[in-house]
Amino acid sequence: MNIGLALIPSKSFQDEVNGYRKRYDTEYARIMPHITIKSHFEINDDELDSVKEEVKKRLEGFGPVDVHATKASSFKPTNNVIYFKVAKTDELEQLFNLFNTEDFHGEAEHPFVPHFTIAQGLTSQEFEDIFGQVELVGVDLKEKIEELSLLRYDEEEDKWKVIDTFKLA
């Protein structure tokens, strides 16, 4: 089973991000707007309950996190991916660090860059055109997220689904 952890914003916040994703993101139908906290990792089906218990344990005393998407940015030249950059707060960094350790299914492959992807799967020309447009429009989305979501990849439907949520209280 392929699972991961993410912060998923409210429907209204998702609608704002999806306004761009519908047009520019080849993965739009596979996953909702999110901030990845723990990238996908593989477990056996019988390990799911212990993973859930470990997530609960690690989140003890951890409160809601403020999310502020401040501008369009990109991973170019590494990838032609455009995203809304989220201000990296101590709380977001701490949350990421709680779950990206050897004793919880391994270290992160990449440094933590909190963001909402809005465009991917682009040619270089598409990237240049779209990035210029999105950068001019700007973004200022704020929200307090009060739960961490556990997602599972559904191979039959070729999409990620929330299978559990954990209160940040």
UniProtKB/Swiss-Prot annotation:
Any one Pfam family here would be 2_5_RNA_ligase2
* HAMAP family named among the record's database cross-references: 2H_phosphoesterase_YjcG
Species for this entry? Staphylococcus haemolyticus (strain JCSC1435)
Question: What NCBIfam families has UniProt attached to this entry?
Answer: PRK13679.1
Q: What is this protein called?
A: Putative phosphoesterase SH1944
Does the UniProt entry include the keyword Ribosomal protein? Answer: no
| GO MF term set | hydrolase activity, acting on ester bonds
InterPro entries per UniProt: 2H_phosphoesterase_YjcG-like (IPR050580), Cyclic_Pdiesterase (IPR009097), YjcG (IPR022932)
Q: What family does the Swiss-Prot or TrEMBL record give for this protein?
A: Belongs to the 2H phosphoesterase superfamily. YjcG family.
The record places the motif (HXTX 1) at 34-37
Which UniProt keywords are given for this protein, alphabetically ordered? Answer: Hydrolase
Q: What is its EC number?
A: 3.1.-.-
The source's domain of life comes to: Bacteria
The yes or no answer to whether the keyword Transport is present is no
Q: Where's the motif HXTX 2?
A: 115-118
The active-site annotation reads H34 (proton donor), H115 (proton acceptor)
